[in-house]
């Protein structure tokens, strides 16, 4: 959420702990509204996102079950290791009454890369470059275009999907080789690799 940008700027959450979910990606939709989706959630309650949003990356490589990287353990009890500085969604969540969280998500005040990089620009000289890289990458291989190709069955659609995947891989590799990005910043600046995204 935009309100949480200060927590990133203050260093509570390192940039490497943030991942970008791009418009067009398929994601779980557990709320009651449809502000974040292009279509009604279908099988497994997933739908394509209509807006970009930043979120804390989960621990491990698996999308489900997702586990917060800030969930720790003390004396056998689960504890939030950043409780005093937890993000708005975490402060809003109450497991037995999810309506406030659903309303928050419906409001749609999500932080995106452009906003975050603009906020970081004063103290991070590479923020403008990150914004340029994100825009160039999005223009060449958006998640929405990629999933349109994935849905197609023609030879042309399959060829276009393979082309987008190759470009995505090459763009990421070049960013790291030219030292424009550290590997752990790729999920924030460029989003997750297209070939690794969950599919409907």
Show where each model-derived region lies:
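Hydrophobic scaffolds flanking metal-cofactor catalytic centers in soluble metalloenzymes
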Residues: 1-154, 159-162, 170, 174-178, ...
């Amino acid at each position: 959420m935009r309100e949480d940008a200060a927590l990133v700027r203050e260093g509570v959450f390192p940039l490497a702990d943030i991942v970008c979910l791009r418009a067009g990606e398929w994601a779980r939709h557990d709320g009651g509204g449809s502000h974040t989706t292009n279509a009604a959630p279908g099988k497994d309650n997933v739908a394509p996102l209509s807006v970009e949003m930043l979120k804390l990356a989960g621990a491990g490589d698996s999308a489900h079950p997702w586990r917060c990287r800030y969930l720790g353990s003390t004396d056998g009890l689960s504890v939030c290791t950043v409780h005093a500085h937890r993000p708005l969604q975490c402060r809003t969540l109450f497991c037995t009454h999810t309506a406030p969280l659903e309303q928050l998500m419906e409001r749609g005040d999500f932080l995106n890369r452009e906003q975050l990089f603009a906020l970081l620009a004063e103290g991070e000289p590479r923020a403008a470059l990150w914004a340029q890289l994100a825009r160039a990458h999005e223009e060449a291989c958006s998640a929405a275009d990629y999933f349109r190709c994935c849905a197609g069955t023609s030879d042309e659609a399959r060829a276009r999907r393979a082309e987008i995947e190759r470009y995505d891989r090459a763009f990421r590799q070049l960013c790291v080789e030219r030292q424009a990005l550290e590997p752990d910043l790729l999920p924030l600046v460029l989003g997750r690799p297209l070939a690794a995204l969950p599919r409907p």
